[in-house]
Regions:
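Conserved phosphate/anionic-ligand binding catalytic regions in large, soluble enzymes, centered on
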Residues: 56-77, 174-188, 192-193, 348-360, ...
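Ferredoxin-type iron-sulfur electron-transfer modules in oxidoreductases and energy-metabolism complexes
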Residues: 33-55, 83-85, 91, 100-105, ...
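Cofactor-/ligand-binding subdomain signature composed of acidic, glycine-rich
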Residues: 1-52
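Short acidic, glycine/serine/threonine-rich loops at helix termini
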Residues: 66, 71-74, 98-101, 140-145, ...
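Hydrophobic alpha-helical positions that pack around
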Residues: 5, 140-266, 278
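Histidine-anchored nucleotide/phosphate-binding helix
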Residues: 108-122
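Short amphipathic, charge-patterned alpha-helical segments
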Residues: 115-119, 266-282
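Gly-rich Lys/Arg/Thr-decorated short loops/hinges at beta-loop-alpha junctions or inter-strand turns
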Residues: 26-33, 89-101, 204-210, 251-256
């Protein structure tokens, strides 16, 4: 049973403050105070490494899906050598079910900017890029405006806030490729190349953008940093689940009465998110299934959700992941064959084609699922689909093949009766 007190939580990422996207309003509500602190309060922050240590202690786990400790990632950057090094901020959210970063771009862009500036200072980085999906044209324009305002106020540029630290900040628009959300593919795109993932090692911290050390963080991840600097690591660790602390931006979509983005602590019960926060299943229907963290996270049946909370440890017990916390809710009338085909169609369309198991595997998955969907499938096709997923997973440069395989494997295994009934109906009608 969850002990997280989510009902009394006060938002810090998207608080209810009018016009918070404007720099003057942001400043009046404590904005950029954390940046001023790390630059000027030398007793508290004697050097950049002290900032890294505080963020590492807070255990801000990446909000882009992997869940890696952000401060630990920062610590992998080698010592500064006077040559360029980069921070690349990943705002290329393109996975079905995920739409939370755009809330920050729209509503509280300066929080993200401040977090990125603190991160850059902590790693002695002088150039920041934020990569935003091309379809987010309105949010790209908003970020351009916010960054220019920060330049005008002296938060970005030469010797910011009278310190000896200088930094530049650029917005880079994507061109509609989901694969560029993969960190090394994003680096290729930033360099003006086709978005092909790179073989690792070397990892970006050793050889990243233009061959120089680079750290890549998700937009929401960086947006947590100012509050950690202001309030301390222990404050952050006191919010939500013990091993996956802090608030999340939950993007809830599908068959609920109140879809949207909600900021709440990690560790909130899945059923509370659906029935209390999002207003329950629309039209009085029953809950059938939930994809908890974006389309790559394994689907869960309604009967698996009792006592399950939105954090890595809890979801792992039922064979799923928190991912990006982009929850897709499905009611009793949902056709799971159609859902799975649509997901597989997406991954086939978005595969870059560099690796054979992914290029060919995603195509076969979509083709066979379309056959079943159209009423021409056989029961043996289900085992063929499962076999194909085993030939894809762990055999490619990046994790897109895994992301395509997991939904197929788990949806078939958890809704096998529904798939078999469709296949048997096909055979019966053919006879």
């Amino acid at each position: 049973m969850s002990t997280v007190d989510w009902k009394n939580y006060e938002p810090v990422l998207i608080p209810d403050i009018k016009d918070l996207h404007k720099i003057d309003v942001y400043e009046k509500n404590g904005g950029y105070e954390a940046l001023k602190s790390v630059l000027k309060e030398k007793k508290k922050w004697p050097d950049p490494k002290s900032v890294v240590n505080e963020v590492k202690e807070a255990n801000i786990r990446g909000r882009g899906g992997a869940g890696f400790n952000a401060g630990l990632k920062w610590s992998f950057m080698p010592p500064a050598d006077g040559k360029p090094r980069y921070l690349a901020c990943n705002g290329d959210e393109s996975e079905p079910g995920t739409f939370k970063d755009r809330k920050l771009f729209e509503y509280n862009p300066h929080l993200f900017i401040e977090g990125a500036l603190i991160a850059a200072y902590a790693m002695e980085i002088t150039t920041i890029y934020v990569y935003i999906r091309g379809e987010y044209k309105v949010y790209i324009d908003m970020m351009d405006k916010a960054i220019q305002d920060a330049y005008d106020k002296g938060y970005i540029g030469k010797n910011i806030l009278g310190s000896d630290y200088s930094v530049d900040f650029y917005v880079h628009s994507g061109a509609g490729a989901y694969i560029c959300g993969e960190e090394t593919s994003m680096l290729e795109s930033l360099e003006g190349k086709r978005g092909y993932p790179r073989v690792k090692p070397p990892f970006p911290a050793q050889r990243g953008l233009w061959g120089r050390p680079t750290t890549i963080n998700n937009v929401e991840t960086l947006s947590h940093v100012p509050a950690v600097i202001k309030n301390g690591a222990d404050w952050f660790k006191g919010i939500g689940a013990e091993n996956h602390p802090g608030p999340f931006l939950y993007g809830i979509s599908g068959h609920v009465n109140r879809p949207g983005v909600y900021e709440l602590p990690s560790g909130i019960p899945v059923l509370d998110l659906i029935h209390e926060v999002a207003g329950g299943i629309r039209n009085g229907k029953k809950l059938k299934a939930v994809i908890p963290g974006g389309s790559s996270t394994p689907v869960l049946r309604a009967d698996q959700l009792d006592g399950i909370t939105m954090d890595a440890d809890s979801l792992r017990t039922v064979g799923s992941m928190v991912g990006t916390a982009g929850m897709v809710v499905m009611d009793e009338d949902t056709d799971m064959i159609d859902v799975l085909w649509r997901i597989s169609h997406f991954y086939h369309h978005e595969s870059c084609g560099q690796c054979t198991p992914c290029r060919e595997g995603t195509g076969w998955l979509e083709k066979i699922l379309l056959k079943i969907k159209n009423g021409d499938g056989e029961v043996k096709d289900l085992d063929l689909l499962l076999d194909i997923t085993t030939q894809m997973e762990g055999r490619t440069i990046c994790a897109l093949a895994d992301a395509a395989a997991w939904p197929v494997r788990h949806t078939i295994n958890r809704f096998r009766d529904e798939f078999e009934a469709r296949c048997k109906k096909s055979v019966h009608e053919l006879a």
